[in-house]
Amino acid sequence: MATGDRVQVILECTEEPGTSRYHTTKNRKNTSDRLELMKYNPVLQKHTLHREKK
């Protein structure tokens, strides 16, 4: 049985760290570098850049 290449990651807001976090999965084979996505921050009430946390 294959172990798979998908791994769970945490995305954290860069503008206000600690206020908004998202959990998602990514494929390590296709995206070896860290994810950066624009996601909604409910505390700031706007879309902000979220980066993959170590």
Curated annotation (Swiss-Prot):
- Cellular component, GO, one term: cytoplasm
Q: What keywords would UniProt list here? A: Ribonucleoprotein, Ribosomal protein
Which InterPro entries does this entry report, sorted A to Z?
Ribosomal_bL33, Ribosomal_bL33_sf, Ribosomal_zn-bd
Q: Does the entry feature the keyword Ribosomal protein, yes or no?
A: yes
GO BP terms in the entry: translation
Among SUPFAM superfamilies, the record links this protein to:
Zn-binding ribosomal proteins (SSF57829)
Instruction: Tell me the HAMAP family matching this sequence.
Output: Ribosomal_bL33
Q: Which family does it belong to?
A: Belongs to the bacterial ribosomal protein bL33 family.
Name listed for the protein in its UniProt record: Large ribosomal subunit protein bL33
Species of the source: Salinibacter ruber (strain DSM 13855 / M31)
Q: Which gene encodes it?
A: rpmG
